[in-house]
Amino acid sequence: MSVENVDNLNEPIEDINNVDIEELPDKKIGTKEVQEANEILRKYKEGKKNLESRVISCEEWWKSNHWSQFKSQSNNINDPKPTSSWLFNSVINKHADMMDNFPEPNVLPREKSDEAVAEALSEILPVVLENNDFEHTYNSVGWDKLKTGTGIYGVFFNTRLQKGLGDIDIKQLDMLNIFWEPGITDIQASRNLFIVELVDIDLLKTRYEELADKISNTGIDISKYEYDDTVDTSNKTMVVDWYYKVNSGIGDVLHYVKYVGDVVLYASENEEEYTEKGYYDHGKYPVVFDVMFEEKGTPAGFGYIDIMKDPQEYIDKLDQAILKNALVLAKPRYFIHDNCGINEEEFANIDNDFVHVASSLEDTHVQQIVGVPIPAQYLEVKQLKVDELKETSGNRDFSQGTTTAGVTAASAIAALQEAGSKTSRDMNKGSYRAYKTIL
């Protein structure tokens, strides 16, 4: 569970407000177990370091901070640093395809006796999704999927919703805030799962008054994006949601612990109600990964930015060379002999009708620096890189409603658009599979 606000904590309030968990005589989860969990969390975090670096880099590419991400930097601070938006344009078109095909639940009976249940679910599920503002969540997860290769849903039961009655809570989870066992491909195969979030210390102390004197800054750090704003986290601490599976002999039982540092805030194994059956009856981690392009050995994938950033880099570098050349040609410069006697200030000011000289002028005293235009073949190289980016991302012109010269028939244009949208259809099917798992 993402703990971005303490009002969203999903453990039963009455179970923890009046009982100090540390004093329970038969508790299975205490300080020792949480300290061991912290060590596992650190190992998981270390194993995910390269992935997190790539995710942060993709976010910078998305924000058009291209030049800070280039493999080789320009050393001349006066060089222009253009950032064309071919990569950005491709991503937003893919996202538009996702939102144009936003799914709706359609529950069908497996057999005749299921018809009544299927009909009831067909009426209930849309209401649950509407209460969760699921379209907004789908939108946000879609951006993550396209940019970084992985969008993550969290599907929880939040006891504080519906005025304390509780309800399903579907959230977007940040890749930097979730940790799993390195080397696994299916997230459900991980031995443990950690979801972390920074929360204000004073809010936690108010929420858990009986543990207020034990709550402090944990010292656990997580990777952060390069924010434009200054983000102060000095008065926040890391709240960890730890999920783990126990083999009961007939299947996996899922348990859940919420803790800060080595202080247990809630543990399902310490509750008689959940000891045998686990925190969720289905026994699965309450997360769903929507992956763009799969990789071996990880439940995460890579996205369109990873594919497009190389051609985008060379497009921008070629743009830099073209613009630099254009600036040199557009503003003539001159070689001037030290002793030619020309008033340089008057010469540089184009508003002066007259320029004073101290002696007679000769051709060798002042010479214009002649620039050489970039040959046409290098301009063509840039266009080839643009075409490469379009082709590799499946964002050809006709997918945006434009066509190349010679294609004018409506049926031909429609056929090109249909053929060109197959990568988007494949992408949407992946999102539909994640949607089905959520439901």
Q: In which residue ranges do the predicted regions lie?
A:
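Extended, helix-rich architectural segments
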Residues: 1-276, 373, 377, 381-384
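Long amphipathic alpha-helical segments
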Residues: 81-125, 129, 157, 266-300, ...
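Short, solvent-exposed secondary-structure capping/transition elements
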Residues: 137, 162-166, 327, 397-402
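Glycine-rich, acidic/polar active-site loops that bind/position phosphate-bearing ligands
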Residues: 306, 319, 323
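Core catalytic machinery and nucleic-acid-binding channels of phosphodiester-processing enzymes
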Residues: 307, 311
